[in-house]
From Swiss-Prot:
It comes from Streptococcus pneumoniae serotype 19F (strain G54). Transmembrane segments: none annotated. Its EC number is 3.1.-.-, 5.6.2.4. Disulfide bonds: none annotated. CDD domains: DEXQc_UvrD (cd17932). One of its GO terms (molecular function) is double-stranded DNA binding. Its cofactor is Mg(2+). It holds the Pfam family UvrD_C. Heterodimer of AddA and AddB/RexB. Keywords: ATP-binding, DNA damage, DNA repair, DNA-binding, Exonuclease, Helicase, Hydrolase, Isomerase, Nuclease, Nucleotide-binding. This is ATP-dependent helicase/nuclease subunit A.
Length: 1216
């Protein structure tokens, strides 16, 4: 098909005007049209929530296909496999519809080919692309194409630990062992072992994996913060902060004296307030840093007088208490900040004093990390097993170092498209740069929805382009999709009201202005005052009803509040449970939520990713059983097994057995005591009665049989033997939640089987792997069971991204943000590198014996403090984006649920807004979502916000006030006169009969596979001939085949099959470098790269391969490598003559030469034969299929077909 030109700006403008003037019920927006049809430059589409970005992507792809672009010329990256599948499904429907609608024969044929090629199109995650890429080009780096992915976290942890200990030993015994010992002690903590260091090493490694070149970043950026440390500049910054903090305090005190303080005229604290004002008043702008530090010290000292109550307003008058509380709260905030600044003066002094020592420690750390990264890389190459990040690194390495590969992809891809661009990381960005020609990128995303920083996603990649394209349109086009087609005006107004007051460049990384605000566009949704967003607060009184210690036994106030609203929606408004979603920022409180919903009989469906598999009781029992089989001298595991339902020893029996110690031994394990009891070799043998002796004998016999069975058998077989011997699998199935328990046990056997298939063998290593997972405070994913159909959805905000629900409750608004990262011993930054806490040993100068002579002081390096500030801003920005994602999931109504003391919250005062935003300190001091929402509610009271708040107390949450779930009986009235059950059965039988008739009529279509390979449909092309007793290749054993009674060959010599030789020969022919002269030596080197056994390699005749390239066809291939295509996959749509149904044929062409008006197709065959005509007849149909596929793909009729026969001593090339 001839390419149709893309639209010009003027044509796009006319299309926009025509759409605006059309009578369509739901029109495309001008920006959507621009995003669909603009071409010829890099395009960044900033698509707000619900703005139809998937629609835009599909329409853009469809437009390009309709203009003659091939689906294989598009690189389309999605964030998840699910998103890729959905995109392909949409495209399939759209292309099929377009084929039916068009009368253009060329377009019909072109789109038909695209539909057939759709399964093989480059549409998927970056990981799926890099896997295919490395499978194809990995040989350039000596990577075998049969590599596997280390997806199992436990296996990955085992490998990491083994490599860590190897590198650890090398450094511990090496030349720099003194420096390394210092590094080890720096992270040892109370454990006094290597675990602290190991934890930081793995953390840094995960960070490095997101960079495009880990070793390069280590060498160039790891120490950057130490190299550019400027203490003079830091001192000046600190002085400015002290100045500002003192002026803020002065303003607060003066305002207080002029206003509220008049109510407390004779209060003692006011004298101290005046003292501080005098101290601050003595300063002027010209004073140096020493003067400001001195005043700060005196001010802080005054605040600490009278046990820290020198400035406290202690008024107890009821009517003045709110004023006093508000003053004390603000004063406390002010002095907390001043105290921190005072501490920073001392810290900065220590940082400067120990800068050299910390730098030396960091260099040692750099050396260790470099060795660990390289050793782990080599180990994974030995295993031929890689993480996804490794695959990406190798892909980048090939694209950077092999220009011919890079250029082939840049020429192939007409456009490089990426969805969810805001969640991209630096390694992925580098790959996209290499695949693009520099002006053909189409990037879709929304920085407000970037919530994967913990996976090393960097929203600044998106933000940098956003700012650059906005300021310099010649660098790229920025298109804004702001219209929201998902949510009601009530949801959007509430969302805008929150974020236009919360998010700016300073805190939030973007300014939530007209460019980012959501615009209501769903004309089908009419405004409804009942759907106004609600901020619901459980009124927690000062008695602490919600103390964590009570939550396990008492339903939380917030959940009773939520249940009341759910029942109201369900029973009063007829809302189905599946229309309601409960969103949480983490799963920490899920147990409380599930307990509450269960209590009221509300069905619930979770997101299925609770990682508590190893905590389930039935799995713990099995793990202890395996531990005992491996080593019965483990008392805890042995007791657990004996007490388990498999054997049922009670406390009395265990107590009797535990007293069976041999008299001549000081200490014995429980197992040794069991042996003594059996042998009656203890002075307490009288405690063992007959029934217990019998029970003990049975236990010991079974345990011995298991231990004996474990040696020659697989873990999988051992586990199932345990299940069957003691009926444990059946037992747990009869317990409450039995199917889920059985699924857990079944999964244990499967996981053990997977473990042994991943090059790890044996019970010992399996147990060690499990213990390491538990030691690292990890767990394995729980096993999913079928959820109820109509159920409330409970999921994390992260899981909800991309989904939508009519009614959304955002729970746990009061749950504090996770700040573990900022408390770590190490904080990393792309800009500054390593920030680390240095442990310094200091002399105390103490003379008395009871005082320590030295103390250890933890000193955060200057870079650590800088990285900490950077991390804090990035974390707060991400939390804002997380809240944005949660709020924009709602279609009709949004509920935000938290808790707090009404009295305390309403007495809270906040600094005035600045430029329509919350004060930056207010935003940065917030501990949770609720703090932000409440501050907005208070500061902007006069703005008539589009969400309301209300407190709900205990009196409104009694059992009677909440109500009960009304359950409708499945049985109707018992009156037989109205019983229509027989009619229903009759109707069902009629339907089944119709289905059977339909199935009979269309049986051929039903039995036809939707996808077939050339060998599967070869029967359509085989000539009819008398071949009784002869097995056709691939068709299975013929009925008349004779059974062989020859003695089996028990020799240890490795057997080589024809299939193995054929597969290895094909790979060899693919790998041969045709850019240089072929010799026997070069072929021998290439053969070494082929992934097969040496026995198979020995069977490949290289002289024969070399002889092929002396033939006319071989010479033609050698002379036209720029026209050569090898190992090319294809898909083709065909019609089954019997059923008249379409199916897809897929296969791989060994190779062909593509000329302007001719194609030369060739196929290698290693089958043994007597006459060439045998193979020609056998493969004529297969080559005919290949010919048809090439003809349809390139619209070329002149196709020459050759079989290259390698099954005899001499090579033969036969034209078919």
């Amino acid at each position: 098909m001839k390419l149709i030109p893309f639209l010009s700006e003027e044509e796009i403008q006319k299309l926009q005007e025509a759409e605006a003037n059309s009578s369509k019920e739901q029109k495309k927006t001008a920006e959507q049209i621009e995003a669909i049809y603009t071409s010829g430059q890099n395009i960044l589409v900033s698509a707000s929530a619900g703005s139809g970005k998937t629609f835009v992507m599909v329409e853009r792809i469809l437009d390009q296909l309709a203009r003659g672009v091939e689906i294989s010329q598009l690189f389309i990256s999605t964030f998840t496999v699910k998103a890729a599948t959905e995109l392909k499904e949409r495209l399939e429907k759209k292309i099929s519809k377009k084929i039916q609608e068009t009368d253009d024969v060329d377009l019909k044929q072109h789109l038909g080919r695209q539909l057939a090629d759709l399964p093989n199109a480059a549409i998927g995650t970056m990981d799926s692309f890099t896997q295919k890429f490395l499978g194809k080009h990995g040989y350039l780096l000596d990577i075998a194409p049969n590599f596997r992915i280390l997806q199992n976290q436990s296996e990955q942890l085992l490998l990491e630990n083994e490599v860590f200990h190897e590198v650890f030993e090398a450094h511990y015994q090496g030349k720099q062992k003194e420096s390394f010992s210092h590094l080890l002690k720096n992270f040892a903590g109370r454990g006094k072992d290597e675990r602290g260091l190991r934890q930081q090493v793995y953390k840094i490694y995960d960070f490095l994996q997101s960079t495009s070149n880990p070793q390069k970043w280590l060498s160039e950026s790891f120490l950057k913060g130490f190299e550019k440390a400027d203490f003079t500049s830091e001192k000046e910054k600190l002085t400015e902060q002290i100045k500002q903090a003192l002026w803020d305090l002065e303003s607060f005190f003066r305002y207080h004296l002029d206003n509220d303080a008049k109510e407390f005229a004779k209060a003692a604290y006011l004298e101290n307030v005046q003292l501080i004002l005098d101290e601050i008043g003595s300063l002027n702008q010209e004073f140096d840093s020493q003067a400001y530090q001195a005043v700060l010290a005196r001010v802080v000292a005054i605040s600490k007088e009278k046990n820290g109550r020198a400035l406290t307003n202690a008024s107890r008058k009821a009517d003045l208490k709110p004023l006093a509380d508000a003053y004390n709260e603000e004063r406390k905030t002010q002095f907390t900040k001043l105290g921190q600044l005072s501490d920073q003066i001392a810290i900065l002094d220590y940082q400067e004093r120990y800068h050299g020592d910390t730098w030396k420690l960091a260099k040692t750390f750099q050396s260790f990390m470099s060795d660990f990264v390289e050793a782990y890389r080599q180990r994974k190459r030995q295993e031929n097993a890689f993480e996804f990040a490794d695959i990406s690194h190798y892909t980048i390495e090939i694209l950077e170092n092999f220009p011919q590969v890079r250029e082939s992809y840049q020429e192939r891809f007409h456009e490089v498209m990426v969805d969810e661009y805001q969640d991209i990381n630096h390694i992925q960005e580098r790959m996209l740069e290499l695949l693009s020609n520099g002006h053909n990128r189409f990037m879709v995303g929304d920085i407000k929805q970037s919530i994967y920083r913990f996976r090393q996603a960097d929203p600044q990649i998106f933000n940098e382009k956003f700012q650059r394209y906005a300021q310099n349109p010649q660098e790229g086009k920025l298109i804004l999709l702001k219209e929201n087609f998902r949510s009601s005006s009530e949801v959007l107004s509430a969302t805008n009201d929150v974020f236009e007051r919360l998010m700016d460049q300073e805190v939030g990384e973007i300014n939530y202005d007209n460019m980012h605000q959501l615009v209501f566009a769903n004309t089908k949704l009419t405004p409804n005052p009942d759907n106004k967003a609600e901020f619901l607060l459980y009124d927690k009184d000062d008695t602490g009803e919600e103390e964590e210690s009570q939550t396990e036994t008492k339903l939380t106030g917030e959940m009773r509040l939520v249940i009341k609203e759910i029942l109201k929606l369900h029973q009063e408004k007829g809302v189905a449970f599946k229309e309601i979603a409960l969103l949480t920022s983490s799963r920490n409180r899920n147990d409380q939520i599930l307990l509450a919903l269960s209590e009221y009989g509300i069905p619930v469906k979770t997101d299925g990713e609770q990682n508590n598999y190893l905590q389930s009781l039935e799995v713990q029992v099995m793990l202890d059983t395996l531990r005992v089989i491996h080593n019965p001298l483990q008392d805890y595991a042995l007791v657990a097994l004996m007490k388990s339902p498999m054997f049922g020893f009670d406390e009395d029996e265990l107590a009797r057995l535990s007293l069976q110690k041999a008299e001549d031994k000081a200490h014995e394990n429980l197992y040794e005591k069991l042996v003594n009891a059996q042998k009656k070799a203890s002075s307490q043998k009288g405690l063992i009665h007959t029934a217990l002796a019998e029970k003990l004998k049975q236990f010991m016999d079974i345990l011995a049989s298991w231990r004996l069975y474990a040696k020659p058998h697989s873990l999988y077989d051992l586990i199932w033997k345990i299940y069957n011997d003691r009926f444990y699998y059946d037992y747990v199935g009869a317990l409450p939640n039995g199917p889920a328990r059985q699924a857990n046990l079944y999964a244990l056997a499967l996981r053990a089987d997977q473990f042994e298939k991943s090059n790890f063998k044996g019970l010992s290593r399996f147990i060690r792997m499990i213990d390491q997972v538990l030691e690292a405070q990890h767990d394995l994913a729980s096993v999913a069971v079928a959820p109820p159909k109509d159920a409330v959805e409970l999921m994390t905000i992260h899981k909800s991204k991309g989904l939508e629900f009519p009614y959304v409750f955002i729970l746990n608004m009061d749950q504090d943000f996770n700040k573990q990262d900022s408390m770590s011993e190490v904080i990393l930054s792309r800009q500054n590198g390593l920030g680390v806490k240095y442990i310094a040993k200091m002399e105390t100068g103490a003379v008395e014996d009871h005082y320590p002579k030295t103390i250890k002081l933890s000193i955060p390096s200057l870079t650590y403090r800088q990285n900490e500030e950077e991390l804090q801003l990035a974390s707060y920005s991400e939390q804002m984006r997380l809240l944005y994602v949660a709020m924009t999931r709602a279609e009709k109504k949004l509920y935000l649920v938290g808790k707090g003391s009404r009295e305390k919250l309403e007495s809270k005062e906040y600094p005035a807004a600045k430029n329509g935003k919350l004060n930056s300190n207010t935003r940065l001091q917030a501990r949770n979502f609720q703090d932000w929402l409440w501050a907005i509610s208070k500061v902007f009271t006069k703005d008539k916000l589009n969400f309301s708040y209300r407190f709900i107390g205990e009196d409104q949450l009694t059992r009677e006030a909440i109500g009960e779930l009304e359950t409708k009986s499945p049985l109707q009235d018992s009156s037989q006169a109205d019983n229509r059950q027989s009619d229903t059965i009759k109707e069902a039988l009629e339907m089944l009969k119709e289905v059977e008739v339909y199935n009979t009529l269309h049986r051929a279509a039903i039995e036809l596979p939707s996808v077939q390979t050339p060998s599967q449909i070869k029967k359509f092309y085989e000539p009819v001939m008398d071949m009784e007793g002869v097995e056709i290749a691939g068709q299975g054993q013929s009925v008349g085949k004779k059974i062989s009674f020859d003695l089996p060959d028990f020799s240890t010599k490795e057997k080589v099959t024809g299939a193995e030789i054929g597969s290895a020969t094909h790979e060899l022919m693919q790998r041969i470098d045709l850019s240089q002269q072929l010799t026997l030596a070069s072929l021998t080197e290439t053969l070494k790269q082929v992934q097969t056994s040496q026995a198979v390699r020995d069977k490949i005749n290289l002289d024969k391969i070399l002889a092929f390239f002396d033939t006319a066809l071989g010479q033609e291939i050698f002379a036209n490598t720029d026209h050569l295509y090898r190992e090319q996959p294809f898909s083709m749509l065909k019609r089954d003559q019997k059923s008249q149904e379409d199916f897809v044929v897929r296969g791989i062409l060994d190779g062909y030469l593509l000329y302007e008006n001719k194609i030369v197709l060739f196929d290698y065959k290693t089958d043994r034969y007597d006459e060439p005509s045998q193979l020609v007849d056998r493969y004529r149909g297969q080559l005919a299929l290949y010919e048809e596929a090439l003809s349809r793909a390139y619209s070329i009729e002149n196709i020459e077909k050759y079989l290259i026969l390698l099954g005899k001593d001499e090579v033969q090339v036969v034209k078919v």
